[in-house]
Amino acid sequence: MVRKPVLRMQRFGCDREGAALVEFTVVLPFLVFLGLGAFEFGSALYGHHVITTGLRDAARYLARRDDPMAADTAAKQLAVYGEIGGSTKRVSWWSVGDVTVSVSTIANPVDPDTGARTYRGPDPIKIVRVATSATYPGLGLFAVLGMGPTLAINTFHEERVIGD
């Protein structure tokens, strides 16, 4: 009678049926976490790309204006909505208040040897800069990873003002 339980235990130790199921059960949480991470980072990367495209559009719009600061509100709407006076945002978590517009100047001196300017155009040259600091809310995976509940997306685009 004592031999039967021992034999059963030995047979159970040699039995490989169900081993794949146990291995899959152990690996499944890591695979789910990896898949959600890829989705989260892909979503953040897509949001960054769309925001960068909006900033580029706004900077190009302002570069064609003689006075870029007179049209900064329209440019902010163009960046966020994709059109001036639009109603559907490019990215739901990005707002007009997140966009800043600034104009700076750089010198364009005349080279005494050649008599030509360093850059084509007048002196000084105006540069318009459209920047943003948007907060990507994410799906919550960043908080699990210890990166905080949100992710800040900071980007900008600069264009030389050429006027009309």
Predicted regions mapped to residue ranges:
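Alpha-helical assembly-interface signal, strongest on the long, hydrophobic N-terminal helix that forms
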Residues: 2-81
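Short, conserved structural patches
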Residues: 2-3, 48, 56-164
